[in-house]
């Protein structure tokens, strides 16, 4: 469950960004949907074989038509994989179900979350798994913390508020080296160059010279 930006230089192919909260399922061609459903079924079998109810938590900007089409396509894939899918919102201003009509005639129903001591769900809906399609760039909402009885995907430490791209690339560097050794290729062929620069703050305009030096070097 992610999207990856690839750069093809002709002589090497490497990922330059990975989004763990993908927002373009509506870009999948119709003929690829059976493959997407198959992949979803395989993941469900691996992570939670008994899963029946899935709670999807999307971004709060629920009037973005392109994003809503993405969410609808994601729900279609999961439903065809055998799950009951409903949508919950982190927007505390939503007090009851909100129905949103899409351009293709579909309708999405967004509902307020209900939190018990150890579980998160909706009114009359107790999910065994929760799928985040919200990057949490503004921080981790308390309502998502300390859920010990449900699968939360991706995990909270993957939120944009705490995740660091330098850590991601460092981990990918290890994976690329192991994979390259397995298939007997130079890891450079699939690994982008990256460097870690401390003290960069674009709002405060600090660390920009150090960043430029790292790029030039």
Show where each model-derived region lies.
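Conserved metal-phosphate-binding beta-hairpin within the catalytic cores
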Residues: 1-25
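Residues at the starts of beta-strands that form the adenosine-phosphate
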Residues: 12, 53, 84
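C-terminal active-site "lid" helix and adjoining low-complexity regulatory extension at the edge
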Residues: 19-55
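Short glycine-rich phosphate-binding loop at a beta-alpha junction
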Residues: 53-58, 129-131
